[in-house]
């Protein structure tokens, strides 16, 4: 597998030379390798590129997944990832892959929020998020929205992050996906003082390895390629690109895409456009507000 894939600039910036590890987890169309504390995602070029990863042709990832099991050995050296599965050694020469910049670009002046407002108009975030509705959640979303709009400070972000981290099920709990999206929006808006509310030493101990890796990448200014495209669509006011990217994000996982998009929307300052914090205090998805 040489020269046929893409690799994130975040991966290329890591010191992975000579590291050993193993297959951490496998999914329907992707997998994770953990080496020397770094979680490397391997996906298909037909999907959005993970900021933690590399992507290879779809037929090749399918073949790799067919023979690979959790715990299989992996070794990285000179831009080559070797995975030792039941089929033998597979070489992925990611050093020859096309690099994709996963650095979150600044929105700058004159960006267009209306294209995002239009793209999310039909999404039922209250029904699609994996975060259980509660009055506490409503308060947290209100505080994060106020912080994004300049009416709250970094302590509100810090308290909200403690509430959300690890909240939910799966390898990337819904609260973590939300925080990744929210932090990406803050980065795009150059609100670096609020980003200080993400204390990675504390947060990483309270969630999964996978979530901790994505939150760490977010804190260092990186995001998955779909979110990079989303920020770019707002910079230039491209409604079609925004609509397509929102759909792409929403297709990720069971609720992960909606959770991360919700965080981004709140970080951009559009919580009121999707019903405000009150709808997330519902006891059920039918709209009854918790007392």
Task: Label the predicted regions.
Residues 226-291:
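Acidic, carboxylate-rich catalytic segments that either coordinate divalent cations
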Residues 1-154, 158-159, 166, 170-175, ...:
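Phosphate/adenylate-binding glycine loop and adjacent helical scaffold
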Residues 58, 180-181, 198, 265, ...:
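Generic preference for flexible, low-structure residues
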Residues 203, 207-208:
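Small-residue-rich helix-loop
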Residues 170-187, 256-268:
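Conserved phosphate/anionic-ligand binding catalytic regions in large, soluble enzymes, centered on
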């Amino acid at each position: 597998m040489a020269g046929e894939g893409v690799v994130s600039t975040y991966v290329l910036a890591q010191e992975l030379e000579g590291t050993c590890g193993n297959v951490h987890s496998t999914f329907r169309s992707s997998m994770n390798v953990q080496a020397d504390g770094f979680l490397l995602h391997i996906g298909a070029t037909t999907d959005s590129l993970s900021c933690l990863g590399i992507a290879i042709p779809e037929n090749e990832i399918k073949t790799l997944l067919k023979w690979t099991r959790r715990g299989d050995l992996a070794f990285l050296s000179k831009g080559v990832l070797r995975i030792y599965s039941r089929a033998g050694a597979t070489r992925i020469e990611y050093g020859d892959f096309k690099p994709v910049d996963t650095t979150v670009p600044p929105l700058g002046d004159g960006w267009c929020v209306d294209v995002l407002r239009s793209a999310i108009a039909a999404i039922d975030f209250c029904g699609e998020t994996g975060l259980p509705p509660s009055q506490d959640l409503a308060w947290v979303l209100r505080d994060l929205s106020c912080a994004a709009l300049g009416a709250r400070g970094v302590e509100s972000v810090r308290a909200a992050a403690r509430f959300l981290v690890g909240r939910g099920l799966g390898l990337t709990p819904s609260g973590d996906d939300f925080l990744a999206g929210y932090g990406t929006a803050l980065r795009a808006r150059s609100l670096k003082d609020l980003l200080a509310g993400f204390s990675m030493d504390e947060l990483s101990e309270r969630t999964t390895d996978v979530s901790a890796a994505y939150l760490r990448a977010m804190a260092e200014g990186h995001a998955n390629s779909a979110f990079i495209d989303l920020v770019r669509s707002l910079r230039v006011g491209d409604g079609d690109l925004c609509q397509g990217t929102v759909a792409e994000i929403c297709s990720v996982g069971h609720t992960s895409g909606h959770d991360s998009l919700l965080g981004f929307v709140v970080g951009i300052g559009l919580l009121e456009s999707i019903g405000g914090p009150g709808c997330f205090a519902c006891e059920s998805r039918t709209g009854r507000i918790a007392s």
